[in-house]
Curated annotation (Swiss-Prot):
Family: Belongs to the iron/ascorbate-dependent oxidoreductase family. GA2OX subfamily.
Any GO MF annotation of the entry: gibberellin 2-beta-dioxygenase activity
Pfam families reported in the protein's UniProt record: 2OG-FeII_Oxy, DIOX_N
Residues engaged in binding Fe cation: H209, D211, H266
Residues forming the catalytic site: R276
GO biological processes: gibberellin biosynthetic process
Matches recorded under PANTHER family: 2-OXOGLUTARATE (2OG) AND FE(II)-DEPENDENT OXYGENASE SUPERFAMILY PROTEIN-RELATED
Cofactors: Fe cation
EC number: 1.14.11.13
Protein name, UniProt field: Gibberellin 2-beta-dioxygenase 2
Keywords: Dioxygenase, Iron, Metal-binding, Oxidoreductase
Pathway in which this enzyme or protein is active: Plant hormone biosynthesis; gibberellin biosynthesis
Top EC class for this record: oxidoreductase
Length: 345
């Protein structure tokens, strides 16, 4: 039986059909920057169309993902246990969180990809490595374009203030490919010998959480399941669109914008009849990068909300918690009145 973290169980929040913000990247730049900021403020999530990622780059990685996940369990395990990179099945993180999925997790570093390719695609490692690198380069460029638009919309003097973090050669960015088999197949020995107790569409594929990185660039096949939570606690189903990308604000960007952008909480429910495959590029800083609100974001009316921390420190804190726990609270600046109260004791 799959046991998600307590916070990743299906909650009683209402689910509502709401239009997801869609941003056409072919629009005039000043208009684009305003739309990006608005979407990040209101939802922490939006869809981009007319992007620059070539269709063939997407389709080639799709084919590799389908080929890998169609292998039997023993072949997939030969790709290496996810510690953290490699193949994983049901386990999400080190603290007991689980979901109805299997996945490949890769570091974006080309050398790391080359090494992993030898076990993931033994019969064509160079081809696999090239396909993954092409995809990462394309979505990284898309990420930087969006971050520069956000900086312009926030009137940050240096428009590269955010994108340069991702462009750094030591960036800790990741690529993850998730595969959610149909619920009815999860009891099949070719997938996993464990049996599930329910076969309805409320099974957790991936529990409720926010992403710790700066931005997540996501796309999937034509099978739904992804839901995002609004600031008011409503769950919004996200319609799949294999040719386009969805953008999620992560915890690190929430800090960099001093809370003006809020990381989006999301989850994935499994499908009873069709497999879902999704790809996420997690844009992250280098491990030693000091993360704190941009100076433009801190004013007398908007005091600093977070104390500085390195990306390595935040990762360590995140991995010490359960999937659905709120991580940023421990990095918030204490209110002045709290400090005064403590001194008076």
């Amino acid at each position: 039986m799959v046991v998600p973290s307590p916070t990743s169980m299906i909650r009683t929040k209402k689910t509502k059909a709401v239009g997801i913000p869609t941003i056409d990247l072919s629009l005039e730049r000043s208009q684009l920057s305003e739309l990006v900021v608005k979407a990040c403020e209101e939802y922490g999530f939006f869809k981009v169309v007319n992007h620059s990622v070539p269709k063939e780059v997407i389709s080639r990685l799709d084919e590799e993902g389908i080929e890998f996940f169609s292998k039997n369990s023993s072949e997939k395990r030969q790709a290496g246990t996810s510690t953290p990179f490699g193949y994983g099945c049901k386990n999400i993180g080190p603290n007991g969180d689980k979901g109805e999925l299997e996945y490949l997790l890769l570091h974006s570093n080309p050398i790391s990809i080359s090494e992993r390719s030898k076990t993931i695609a033994k019969d064509h490692p160079i081809k696999f490595s090239c396909i993954v690198n092409d995809y990462i380069k394309a979505v990284k460029d898309l990420t930087c374009e969006i971050l520069e638009l956000a900086a312009e919309g926030l009137w940050v003097p240096d428009k590269s203030s955010l994108s340069k973090i991702i462009k750094d050669e030591h960036s800790d960015s990741l690529l993850r490919i998730n595969h959610y088999p149909p619920v009815k197949k999860l009891g099949n020995d070719n997938w996993d010998p464990s049996k599930i107790q329910n076969s309805n569409n409320n099974n957790i594929g991936f529990g409720e959480h926010s992403d710790p990185q700066i931005l997540t660039i996501l796309r999937s096949n034509n099978v739904g399941g992804l839901q995002i939570s609004t600031h008011h606690g409503l769950w919004i189903p996200v319609p799949p669109d294999p040719s386009e990308f969805y953008v999620m604000v992560g915890d690190a960007l929430q800090v960099l914008t001093n809370g003006r952008f809020v990381s989006v909480r999301h989850r994935v429910l499994t499908n009873t009849t069709k497999p879902r495959m999704s790809m996420m590029y997690f844009a992250a800083p280098p491990l030693n990068w000091l993360i704190s609100p941009l100076s433009k974001m801190v004013t007398a009316h908007s005091p600093c909300l977070y104390r500085p921390f390195t990306w390595a420190q935040y990762k360590q804190a995140a991995y010490a918690l359960r999937l659905g726990d709120t991580r940023l609270d421990q990095f918030k600046v204490q209110k002045q009145e709290d400090s005064n109260d403590s001194h008076s004791l």
